[in-house]
Each structure stands twice: as C-alpha cells, then as structure tokens.
Amino acid sequence: MLVQFMVKNVLSFKEETVLDMTAIKAYKEHECNLIDIGMKEKFLRVAAIYGANASGKSNLYMAMSLFQRIIMESLNNVGEGEKNAIDRYYVPFSFEKTEENSEFQIVEIYGGYEYKYGFEYNAECIVTEWMY
C-alpha cells in the first residue's frame, strides 16, 4: 500500500514534493474512505489531485512513471551506443539549469511492515540508493 511518494528536482518540482496518503484528523474524513491496518495512523483509500492549469498535476503522474521506468529498465542491458535508463529518464527541474541530483523516494506498507526505498541520481549514474 502506498503511503508516500516524494520527488525532488524532477520536471517542475525543484523542491522536495510529497504525495502523502496518511489520513490527518484536521479534515472531516468519512470512515469509508480510510484504511485501518492496525497501525498508529489510518490511510486514505484514494486521493484527488487538483489545481490550476500548469500547476504540476500531470508532472506528478509523470514523475511516478519515471520512477517506475528507471527501476524496471535499469536491470536491462543496453546495446552499445544506446542510452541507459538513467540517462534516458533524467529530467531535472525544467525552469532553470541545475547541477543538483534528482531524487525519488517511496514509502509503502507491505505485510504489516513499512519500507522506504529511494535513490538520488543524475544523467550518469545513481549516486545513492537506500531501502529500509
């Protein structure tokens, strides 16, 4: 189950941006929209992403897709002269030239355990990767 998705320095997201599926008590949540898995927090079944035109809604979806593609395709061997998945899917912040690395992180709950997986990368390589 998805708990959080974080993206930084990708597409239109310069700063760290987090989609968080943790229910908060500040809103009047309907119980039917919450998932209680016996942990401290409850989680949302669905989330609506809305905003003005050009506010990043589609880019959040694209960032999730880039994250998935990098993971899936980085295992494939590429032919000589072809771009690898890291180079092909490196799309840093679009509105200014930056040398900063891009970053993804996902937090999931599976089998009652919380897992965090993420990596920081640039056009050449994965700089750091973590899972705990």
Label every model-predicted segment.
Residues 1-132:
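P-loop NTPase switch/coupling surface
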